Amino acid sequence: MIRRSCALLSSSWRDHGISYLKYLNVCTETLHSTVKESRRAKYERWSKPCYTAQRPDGAGGQETIDKVPIHTKDY
């Protein structure tokens, strides 16, 4: 049991195949769920857990990328 938990601590979210956007959304959701009700509105005004990846589509607009690559070099 201890060996297994040490192995989990030594690896990061990238090692588990989680993209930065998924990591950012989970951290934002966690922050919103742990703050007091009176402070939650303040945090929700400045951050929402719905970050998406976008890239220019060539016509001056933005195209949303649904399947985000795990590694930055794959963009």
From Swiss-Prot:
Q: Which GO terms describe its cellular component?
A: mitochondrial inner membrane; proton-transporting ATP synthase complex
Subcellular location(s): the record lists: Mitochondrion; Mitochondrion inner membrane
User: How does the protein's chain sit in the membrane according to the entry?
Assistant: Peripheral membrane protein
CDD domains per record: F1-ATPase_epsilon (cd12153)
Q: Which UniProt keywords apply?
A: ATP synthesis, CF(1), Hydrogen ion transport, Ion transport, Membrane, Mitochondrion, Mitochondrion inner membrane, Transit peptide, Transport
Major localization class: mitochondrion
Instruction: Return the transit peptide range from the UniProt record.
Output: 1-9
SUBUNIT field: F-type ATPases have 2 components, F(1) - the catalytic core - and F(o) - the membrane proton channel. F(1) has five subunits: alpha(3), beta(3), gamma(1), delta(1), epsilon(1), plus the additional subunit P18 (Tb427.05.1710) that is not present in F(1)F(o) ATP synthase from metazoa. Subunit P18 (Tb927.5.1710) interacts with the alpha subunit with a 1:1 stoichiometry; the interaction is direct. Subunit gamma is part of the central stalk. F(o) has three main subunits: a, b and c.
Which family does the record assign? Belongs to the eukaryotic ATPase epsilon family.
Q: What is this protein called?
A: ATP synthase subunit epsilon, mitochondrial
**Which organism is this protein's natural source?**
Trypanosoma brucei brucei
